């Protein structure tokens, strides 16, 4: 979350007049994040998150907003702790503020973690499985635009300069892309996936998962791929060493709610390598193409190069701690 567009009291009051809520008593910007402008809005005893969707290179496509907001509405109605879009008096959940699309959603208690503990990994694994089950009857569809086709496109745009990030990187990515494209699984169970459930997108309160946020990469894809993304995001330490204790807990939590098929388990190593490739290629492209006036420093792509090298040597899901 971040603040790119500043708003004043008058603008906010006009926007909030479209909602059947108490008068605003306070609001403040939220400084973290990379895509949109976010504010905490207080109305008496209640708190909400106001998001202004920015027209930037990394911003959300306005055409996708009905999907994202509709998905949050659906998941919240099915018991998932995620932001619930607040409906305006006219029944809409998307409005306009500062000449940009904007939405108001419920405020969730808790906070994210930088160094997740094994018990948190288990809890979030179960929460991901619950999300997958809750999304099974969501009727809207959105293609995963961060899939293998996009990795190839980003690689081709970055290939000539890739070795600036790490010597030999261009050749390594080229070879690994070919391997992944050849072996990429087909026919696995699909449905709604979050596709970006990093530790900063999960809130914990008193040891329990209190909120899943930032659904702006959500789409329809293989469910096990979502879990593979989390293996990368939750189970490597700051020095990029793999923590099998955390991975074992994450997988056990997921399996306790939605047991994976034998085919999903067999595909987990290639899916985890693909997830690492996704973030390697996106971060490499961003690192090589940082605008001079960028408000956010691009993340180092080498962290995901190291993850990808680890996954190349994984022979089965047992290497991730999956217990049969």
Predicted regions and their residues:
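Active-site acidic catalytic loop and adjacent metal/ATP-binding pocket
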Residues: 31-42, 49-50, 85, 178-225
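Conserved N-terminal boundary motif of the eukaryotic protein kinase catalytic domain
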Residues: 21-28
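ATP/Mg2+ or Mg2+-diphosphate-binding catalytic cores
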Residues: 159, 279-324
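An alpha-helical support segment within catalytic cores of ATP-dependent transferases
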Residues: 7-19, 139-141, 153-195, 205
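All-alpha amphipathic helical-bundle segments outside canonical DNA-binding/catalytic cores
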Residues: 260-272
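ATP-binding pocket architecture of kinase catalytic cores
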Residues: 43-139
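Active-site activation/catalytic loop segments of kinase-like enzymes and analogous catalytic loops
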Residues: 224-259, 273-291
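A cross-family kinase active-site recognition segment
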Residues: 114-167, 188-190, 295-301
